From Swiss-Prot:
Keywords annotated in UniProt: ATP synthesis, Cell membrane, CF(0), Hydrogen ion transport, Ion transport, Lipid-binding, Membrane, Transmembrane, Transmembrane helix, Transport
Gene Ontology CC, one term: plasma membrane
Recorded superkingdom: Bacteria
Record gene name: atpE
PROSITE patterns per the UniProt record, alphabetical: ATPASE_C
Function of the molecule: F(1)F(0) ATP synthase produces ATP from ADP in the presence of a proton or sodium gradient. F-type ATPases consist of two structural domains, F(1) containing the extramembraneous catalytic core and F(0) containing the membrane proton channel, linked together by a central stalk and a peripheral stalk. During catalysis, ATP synthesis in the catalytic domain of F(1) is coupled via a rotary mechanism of the central stalk subunits to proton translocation.
Family statement: Belongs to the ATPase C chain family.
Reversibly protonated during proton transport (site feature) positions: 64
Source species of the chain: Clostridium acetobutylicum (strain ATCC 824 / DSM 792 / JCM 1419 / IAM 19013 / LMG 5710 / NBRC 13948 / NRRL B-527 / VKM B-1787 / 2291 / W)
Gene3D superfamilies attached to this UniProt entry: F1F0 ATP synthase subunit C
Subcellular location: Cell membrane
Protein known as: ATP synthase subunit c
Entries under Pfam families matching the protein: ATP-synt_C
Length: 81
């Protein structure tokens, strides 16, 4: 099987972008976990909502940033020559 170098590099570029996009899964799992635990905490102690919500929002932001970085890397691999 003969593959020219351009086709091989293009295939590796797509493979790398796909693997980088897998990092978005971690962000989704993290956001779901953080939100679920915050809802449980507020359900148990409704008076703690004012303390739980800011912490939850910080956790959501950190989880989302990792997904955005993974998406950025995947897009860079696809469209930058």
């Amino acid at each position: 099987m003969n593959i020219d170098s351009h086709t091989f590099l293009l295939g590796m570029q797509y493979l790398g972008a796909g693997l980088a996009a897998i990092g978005c899964i971690g962000g989704g799992v993290g956001i779901g976990t953080v939100t679920g635990k915050a809802v449980e905490a507020i359900g148990r102690q409704p008076e703690s909502a004012s303390k739980v919500m800011p912490t939850m929002i910080m956790g959501l932001a950190f989880a989302e940033v990792t997904s955005l970085y993974a998406l950025f890397v995947a897009i860079m691999l696809l469209f930058v020559k």
